[in-house]
């Protein structure tokens, strides 16, 4: 039974995404349905966590929009994600960057990896 589930989920995994880690700045192109039409919305922000593994892997991206912090958690292998672009690579020493929620302005910056 476990082998059948593994075979089914292996077909659903997406391999077209780039490697990214917490601290990286991403542009996530998400398909959004509005009424009867579908468009692509770009959500750009810092990855604050990656969670789980396999087909159920998710990641959370945080950005500041009009002075308000916005976080979006997305399934990595979702068909709703059109593409993911890494715009900056960041240096961090943590796997979960929850402390960024309490920082404002220049204090919330992350150093860039060379």
Curated annotation (Swiss-Prot):
GO terms for biological process: translation. It comes from the Bacteria. Keywords: Ribonucleoprotein, Ribosomal protein. Signal peptide: none annotated. One of its GO terms (molecular function) is structural constituent of ribosome. GO terms for cellular component: cytosolic large ribosomal subunit. This protein is located at the 30S-50S ribosomal subunit interface and may play a role in the structure and function of the aminoacyl-tRNA binding site. Belongs to the bacterial ribosomal protein bL19 family. NCBIfam families: rplS_bact. This is Large ribosomal subunit protein bL19. The gene is rplS.
